[in-house]
Amino acid sequence: MKFSTILPILWANCCLCMIIPDFDGIVRFIENIDGTRSVRAGEGLGQHDPGNFHTEHQHVAHKTEFLPYRYVIVFNEDISLQQIQSHMQVVQKDHSTSVGKLTENDAFWRVISSSVSSKSQFGGIDNFFDINGLFRGYTGYFTDEIIKIISQDPIIKFVEQETTVKISNSSLQEEAPWGLHRVSHREKPKYGQDLEYLYEDAAGKGVTSYVLDTGIDTEHEDFEGRAEWGAVIPANDEASDLNGHGTHCAGIIGSKHFGVAKNTKIVAVKVLRSNGEGTVSDVIKGIEYVTKEHIESSKKKNKEFKGSTANLSLGSSKSLAMEMAVNAAVDSGVHFAIAAGNEDEDACLSSPAGAEKSITVGASTFSDDRAFFSNWGTCVDVFAPGINIMSTYIGSRNATLSLSGTSMASPHVAGILSYFLSLQPAPDSEFFNDAPSPQELKEKVLKFSTQGVLGDIGDDTPNKLIYNGGGKKLDGFW
């Protein structure tokens, strides 16, 4: 066991709402009792406005930035690759024909003409994704004519208009000495007491922690050389964090002074641009990358490899596609922690917080209350410190900053997932008996959390605060 004395969300919150127009033969608003709106495929007639969604609950309290004529198309699970290839070939051919009919006065032409050099190249399929065969689809720009045809193909599960995801700064320039102390103690700290973080020596060793965010300053000295770049998903972006959000989250997961899992390997997967903005499809591609990397690491049977975790401190309004991508990654063995959001509303109304197989994290305060901004509800699984959290930042090799948000709470849980995975016997040990699945570890983490201590929670929100065991024997955990 070790302890460290601690020196005295930015939730990637989109603040969006899905504006869902009627679209001839494709979607129709259905008003729900709770005031949300649903849309169904293949119903209704209406005037075109770029937007074709199929989802169960589209929250309309935020302002959504949807991308005109750009869509995420998801296949049914039970179709073959041959069917997928045939469908995509037909779509691309038909789209080229459709584009050839356009004039310079058409809205589709105006929307995307700045990004291509000739009319024959306008739009069409630009990305295919496949998360371990469990979640497959593609993205692209399509005309009204073609998106209607796509939506009516029986092998298509649903079509969702591409939307943006963003981060929303909520920084506080104050010392924040309490977060690590709280997750390693059952009792809340008292004002003025000495604070310490209690943990086992392994502390994430053998585990790879992926941070899907704005990138990471891998040269920051507090990462001790354990941070590296994995992928840059947004087109024409670079392997650097010019925002700071990703570096801060990574520090909470695994940096020397501010991290929960101080020996974990940290991998940057840039899904948000340096300005803090991104798209649902880029997040999905990032999840696909993480899943493939995890599967490859598992196949190598490295005796030191103990598993993969991932953190998503970002969000948008409801996106069934993004939540399905997360669930597919979890089913493939990746342990996910996700920020609940900062709107002081039901977390089930946003994505990916509503993904059922990940761990969705709300933010708590020093006094063990729900943070005033933290989302709540049945989609929240557990709470973690999210007010005035000190961590690594950009600007110099030893820069730090104190931030608040569910973005800061979620990495505490990602770090604890990495921490517990590292405490398992090595794969080549006689005591090794299969690493816990994400579902098994989720159940153990939630059961082991500190129960019933949080205030201002609400009747339908789990009253659970994350806990790492305090460096003690964990017989009660396993």
UniProtKB/Swiss-Prot annotation:
First and last residue of the signal peptide: 1-17
TM region(s), chain numbering: none
Organism: Saccharomyces cerevisiae (strain ATCC 204508 / S288c) (Baker's yeast)
EC category: hydrolase
Domain Inhibitor I9, first and last residues per copy: 70-167
Gene Ontology molecular function: serine-type endopeptidase activity
Biological role: Serine protease with unknown substrate.
GO biological process: protein catabolic process in the vacuole; proteolysis
Single GO cellular component term: fungal-type vacuole lumen
EC number, UniProt record: 3.4.21.-
Domain annotation Peptidase S8: ranges: 177-478
Similarity remark: Belongs to the peptidase S8 family.
Residues forming the catalytic site: 213, 245, 407
Domain of life: Eukaryota
This protein's UniProt keywords: Hydrolase, Protease, Serine protease, Signal
SUPFAM superfamilies in alphabetical order: Protease propeptides/inhibitors (SSF54897), Subtilisin-like (SSF52743)
PROSITE patterns per record: SUBTILASE, SUBTILASE_ASP, SUBTILASE_HIS, SUBTILASE_SER
Name of the protein in question: Subtilisin-like protease 3
PANTHER family recorded: CEREVISIN-RELATED, PEPTIDASE S8
Induction of expression: Undergoes rapid but transient induction upon transfer to sporulation medium.
